[in-house]
Amino acid sequence: MSWKKFITQQESMEYYNALQAFLKSQKELGKNIYPPEHLVFNAFNLTPLENIKVVILGQDPYHREGQSHGLSFSVPEGIKIPPSLRNIYKELSTSIEGYKIPESGNLAHWAKQGILLLNSVLTVEQADPGCHAKKGWETFTDNAISEINNARSGVIFLLWGSYAHKKGSLIDKNKHTVLTSTHPSPLSAYRGFLGCKHFSQVNDILAERREQLIIW
């Protein structure tokens, strides 16, 4: 199944209609919702189901103007790199030989190499993190994870922090690889994320399979 077919399937479900009604009501109230509507499904558009090598699961989008473009942990060109992404870059610099920390926080080049940068909740209101939780997006993205689990094999899931760890129950660990650590947030990065070597492990696994390595 393609992501287009998957999304069409979800659109016919009751939970999705309720979710869209909620989003419509918020827009009618004049709320600023991020990311912009055309980027809500950016992760799915940039990383087709059949191309997925890695899934990096986030929680919900950045909630400040201009930050969110539909990819977990990523920000568009010209936007200040957020603290969690700074720690991701820090970990990359210690685990990937020759890695130079970029000036941009745009991870679209990861997405185009088969890394699905998926938030569990796909929209947020300006300056109100988590406000679109439990409105239906979790069902949508859980169903997407289940689709990956069923349709593919050998996908590497990077689950950072307790929220992401719970999604591990949707993944068949006999078919896929699950790597876990604490969240890269400054609050928890030093309790296990920094030093986790997930990025080098991903390339080691891909090398063993004689697959194209990720250019981080």
UniProtKB/Swiss-Prot annotation:
The keyword Zinc does not apply. It comes from the Bacteria. One of its GO terms (biological process) is base-excision repair, AP site formation via deaminated base removal. Keywords: Cytoplasm, DNA damage, DNA repair, Hydrolase. Belongs to the uracil-DNA glycosylase (UDG) superfamily. UNG family. Excises uracil residues from the DNA which can arise as a result of misincorporation of dUMP residues by DNA polymerase or due to deamination of cytosine. This is Uracil-DNA glycosylase. The gene is ung.
